Amino acid sequence: MTLKILQWNIWYKEDIDKIVEEIKRSQADVITAQEFIQHSATDLDTAKYIADKLGFNYFYHTADTWSGREEKEAQGNAIFSRFPIVSTQHTYINPPKHNPVNALEEGRIYVETTLDVKGEPLVAGTTHLSFTPGFEITEQRKKEADNLINIIKNKKTNYIFGADLNAGPDSYVIKEFEKQLSNVGPDYREKTFANQPFDYYGMYQVEDLEWRLDYLFASDDIKVTNAQIMETEYSDHLPILAEIEI
């Protein structure tokens, strides 16, 4: 059976209705995605909003929380599916801090769903690894990656993983992933970041599409028939769309 898988960091500042439009345009069956936010004062819940607009099943879990931030109280990752979700799980790979002082200190979470694809099980996982200026792989980031690898190392069949790994193709993070799973996204030379000018508190800027930070991996039994970087005006990351056979 052929499925379309979409991986996208939607950027929490983006117009959520534009994100919905682009997801619909992709005709994706399963979406792994990052930077969903919640705020109780405005009843904001971007993961639920997207799921409702698509008519999809979904699972979201918070990675970290803040007090007194105008734009968000919580941020996390989500998986959306055209098919029923049989079970879910989540694991923190960097514990939540509540009011983290910078991006490296933020909690990071692995989110997983088991889907029933017309009688066939398919496990989908996602995460959003820590940001460092220049995407430097520090010892802390290596530890975070190792925590993630310990989760996925036994995923040998019917498994897909999409994520913003905040790491380039030649990094420790990606090299470790390649020992466990196969790339089912486009060639690593195709870039996904920054789709819009990026400025991290004046410490680090990216003006153009200079980096590949977003990936789709799968167990060896899954065959990829097509993969592309989607062009869009929205979000600071470009989405990856792949067609797979299970």
Region roles according to the model:
Residues 112-125, 138-162:
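His/acidic metal-ligating clusters that form di-metal
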Residues 2-11, 89-91, 121-131:
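Active-site-proximal beta-strand elements of phosphoester/diester hydrolases
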Residues 12-15, 38-42, 67-69, 98, ...:
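Active-site environment of divalent metal-dependent phosphoester hydrolases
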Residues 1-56, 60-73, 146, 246:
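N-terminal, active-site-proximal structural segment of metallo-dependent hydrolase catalytic domains
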Residues 153-159, 166-246:
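Metal-dependent phosphoester-hydrolase catalytic domains
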Residues 35-121, 228-231:
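Structured beta-strand-rich core segments of catalytic domains in phosphoester-bond hydrolases
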Residues 128-148, 169-178:
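Active-site-proximal segments of metal-dependent phosphoesterases and phosphodiesterases across multiple
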Residues 32-34, 60-62, 160-164, 183-186:
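Active-site neighborhood of phospho(di)ester-bond hydrolases with catalytic His/Asp-centered motifs
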